[in-house]
């Protein structure tokens, strides 16, 4: 039987570092980090993620501002909120919950986030830095994937890695981060032929497609590492893309949902807000 990769345990050390940083600043009467999180509409995964952000931020003494907009807002409505946050010196990080409702122009809206406050690497400039290897904020979910794999103390170099999903939020950036670790990376998507065959050759399988319990044991190589990035509402519960019960006996390591990638992602987001505050003061 495979082992569970506990995102909460991996996050603990980082949380302690954040807590110490915030406490020192409070003690010296210095500004503490503040994150503003924008949610448009009522996407289940986004609501869950925002709630997690708020809970962790509060536990670490980081200020958290929730901005919830109706689903029928316009591009300009969202952009106006972003501009206010760009101009607010007390806000170090802006988090826009994706996906946005389909009638909104996601690229146009994202472009308006200040790169100095883009703590989840959403803007073109931030992503350009990522792909060119320049210093900048790493996208939190992809960084969480890499951090969890590294927590297993395995050498990623030369490993066959399949990333299932090609979104700009997870699939593409996580593939780039894995390439930076010298993995051999294959990206699969809805048009990939013989998907089971491709996935079943992976030493490491990263799944980010938003289809609850889509991946079962037939997609898994014996003793593979399986990282489930999915968070969907399914039968009243938050569920991943991997059918955990069917995969755990075949894989060597699997991340649960909840308690896996998402548990660490939120912590890395807050860590980025601390880094943004340091950059602002420098």
Swiss-Prot record:
Any one cellular-component term (Gene Ontology): cytosol
Reactions this protein catalyses: (6R)-5,10-methylene-5,6,7,8-tetrahydrofolate + NADP(+) = (6R)-5,10-methenyltetrahydrofolate + NADPH; (6R)-5,10-methenyltetrahydrofolate + H2O = (6R)-10-formyltetrahydrofolate + H(+)
CDD domains found in the cross-reference section: NAD_bind_m-THF_DH_Cyclohyd (cd01080)
UniProt key word NADP: yes
NADP as UniProt keyword: yes
Pathway field: One-carbon metabolism; tetrahydrofolate interconversion
Superkingdom of the source species: Bacteria
A Gene Ontology molecular function term of the record: methylenetetrahydrofolate dehydrogenase (NADP+) activity
SUPFAM superfamilies: Aminoacid dehydrogenase-like, N-terminal domain (SSF53223), NAD(P)-binding Rossmann-fold domains (SSF51735)
Keywords for the protein's UniProt record, in alphabetical order: Amino-acid biosynthesis, Histidine biosynthesis, Hydrolase, Methionine biosynthesis, Multifunctional enzyme, NADP, One-carbon metabolism, Oxidoreductase, Purine biosynthesis
InterPro entries: Aminoacid_DH-like_N_sf (IPR046346), NAD(P)-bd_dom_sf (IPR036291), THF_DH/CycHdrlase (IPR000672), THF_DH/CycHdrlase_cat_dom (IPR020630), THF_DH/CycHdrlase_NAD-bd_dom (IPR020631)
Pfam family, one: THF_DHG_CYH
Biological process terms in GO annotation: L-histidine biosynthetic process; methionine biosynthetic process; purine nucleotide biosynthetic process; tetrahydrofolate interconversion
Positions with a binding annotation for NADP(+): 165-167, 190, 231
Gene3D superfamilies xrefs: Leucine Dehydrogenase, chain A, domain 1, NAD(P)-binding Rossmann-like Domain
UniProt EC number: 1.5.1.5, 3.5.4.9
NCBIfam families per record: PRK14172.1
Purpose: Catalyzes the oxidation of 5,10-methylenetetrahydrofolate to 5,10-methenyltetrahydrofolate and then the hydrolysis of 5,10-methenyltetrahydrofolate to 10-formyltetrahydrofolate.
Record note on quaternary structure: Homodimer.
Family: Belongs to the tetrahydrofolate dehydrogenase/cyclohydrolase family.
Name of protein: Bifunctional protein FolD
UniProt organism field: Clostridium botulinum (strain Eklund 17B / Type B)
